Amino acid sequence: MTVSDRASKGEYTDEGGPAILKFFSEAIKSPLTVIYRCIPDDVEAIQSALIELVDEQGCHVVVTTGGTGPAARDVTPEATEAVCDRMMPGFGEQMRAISLAYVPTAILSRQVGGLRGSSLVFNLPGRPKSIRETIDEIWKAVPYCVDLMGGPYMDMDAEVCDAFRPVSARR
């Protein structure tokens, strides 16, 4: 789900959403259904979309891009926190640590991750290069997280993303 005022109005070509879709197509070998949304930087719109994707569409993982900086309209983390039952602070911490190896301004990022029911929701940076740098690393934990929440087993292409699972959880 891309969060961007300009992209949602068609004033700017969304590059973040396609970068995430590219990763999915390269890394995930299991059959999957992808639902794409491009919405404005608005807390209520973001919350509504997240709730719809999890509660109505049954998404086990919802990945957002955009709206995580310090600008007044960057409200994706607040919307994510509002709809999640439990937060997963390691996601935001790890994404900032990864990005700090590339740019000092990564400290300005406010990405979060959390659980809504048995679904994982997390925010990625907005730029395709930063998306790839972070998703390559954090996705290593996502399939096992989905396993633990009772979701479908995600088979990964180990050459693209060597996801970690304890021996007892491997198929």
Predicted region positions:
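Non-catalytic beta/alpha edge segments that cap or flank active sites
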Residues: 1-171
